[in-house]
Amino acid sequence: MAKDEIIEFEGEVIDTLPNTLFKVRLENGHEIIAHISGKMRKHYIRILTGDKVKVEMTPYDLSKGRITYRGKN
């Protein structure tokens, strides 16, 4: 997949699910299921309910995404 096809959104974690999955409400109001990117997992970055995050999505499946950044609170 080419980098230019990735869609990036900001959102807020509203629920934590098993296996490092999270329910995220995007800034446009949609709710998606997102997982942590590999670098965040490698560096043990913790994500909690209420955190502001940046999510990458593909145009092929707009119900799933990858969390790439956790905002500083």
Swiss-Prot record:
InterPro entries: NA-bd_OB-fold (IPR012340), RNA-binding_domain_S1_IF1 (IPR006196), S1_domain (IPR003029), TIF_IF1 (IPR004368)
Keywords: Cytoplasm, Initiation factor, Protein biosynthesis, RNA-binding, rRNA-binding
Coarse class of the protein's main subcellular location: cytoplasm
Cellular component annotations (GO), alphabetically ordered: cytosol
MF annotations from Gene Ontology: ribosome binding; rRNA binding; translation initiation factor activity
Localization (cell): Cytoplasm
Pfam families: eIF-1a
Domain S1-like: 1-72
CDD domains registered for this protein in UniProt: S1_IF1
SMART domains, per database record: S1 (SM00316)
Keyword Protein biosynthesis annotated: yes
Top-level lineage group: Bacteria
Family of the protein in this entry: Belongs to the IF-1 family.
Function: One of the essential components for the initiation of protein synthesis. Stabilizes the binding of IF-2 and IF-3 on the 30S subunit to which N-formylmethionyl-tRNA(fMet) subsequently binds. Helps modulate mRNA selection, yielding the 30S pre-initiation complex (PIC). Upon addition of the 50S ribosomal subunit IF-1, IF-2 and IF-3 are released leaving the mature 70S translation initiation complex.
Assembly behavior: Component of the 30S ribosomal translation pre-initiation complex which assembles on the 30S ribosome in the order IF-2 and IF-3, IF-1 and N-formylmethionyl-tRNA(fMet); mRNA recruitment can occur at any time during PIC assembly.
The protein, known as: Translation initiation factor IF-1
Gene field: infA
